[in-house]
Amino acid sequence: NFATMAMRAVGIPVVVQTTTWTKMDLAHSWCAVLQDGEFYDFSPAYAGPDEYRQKLMTVRYLKPAKVYRNLFDADFKKSRTDDGYTTYLKSPLLKDVTAESGYPVLDLRIEADKEPSSAESLVYLCAYNYYEWKPVAIGIQTDAVCEFKDVVGNNIFIIAEGGKEQELRYITAPFLVDSSGHIRKFIPDKNKLVTQELWIEKGKTPRNLHFWDVEKEYFIPVSCDSITSDTTQFYTRIPDNALLWYATSHRAL
């Protein structure tokens, strides 16, 4: 923000763009400069426009699912029936610029697995980020069909409704949407178990395998059957077609 204000103070048309990561924790912000009617991404600390845009578009875990621009002039034309749920995505100082940023986007359309609270409502596209599902986009649900505009594929999401209680109510199972828009839902088959051998990083905090239980709506630990060496863990009781999460059980303090 300091670099942005310093450049704007001398007349350089710079803005801040931001994303919530979908393949790792937390969020990220960078700058974009206006030149001949187009914005070019760059990082004041790391790289210039060409190099930085290329990095965001080609490094798998850095490719944003949604990109937003922080505005200096509030856009009060945004109007939608509010459900009372609080999220920064509703700010009039935020603009969705995913499509204009050059990423391959798609319009996501998916049917809810659980009955929504009303025939039409706002819905939230969420990514799992730092031990919780966090909204990354707002869409609309009509007759149990959820729609979101300009989403980057090859990401895992879940869809939820919000409310004045500030809690999310999940109305789909977690799912993967690929770059073509094909959807695979992760609904565990507890009657069909699969095995998996996982690598243990030396010197790192021990991690545990979990799967998302669509009925309980949280990640359930999977028991480790054996540690085959000082570098591997062996699991034999993993529900088939489950969304797996391999991580420490608690947030860092």
Enumerate the language-model features and the residues they cover.
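Short Pro-Gly-centered beta-turn/loop motif in secreted/extracellular proteins
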Residues: D36, A144-Q166, F234-R251
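A short, amphipathic beta-strand motif
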Residues: P104-P116, T195-L198
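Structured interaction patches on ligand/partner-binding surfaces of diverse proteins
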Residues: G163-N191, A252-L253
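Short, ordered, surface-exposed loop/turn motifs in non-cytosolic proteins
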Residues: E115-E132, K202-Y218, V222
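Short, acidic Ser/Thr/Gly-rich low-complexity loop/linker segments typical of extracellular
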Residues: Y130-V145, I227-S229
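Beta-strand-rich domain onsets/edges
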Residues: S79-L106
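Hydrophobic/aromatic-rich core segments of domains that either
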Residues: N1-D82
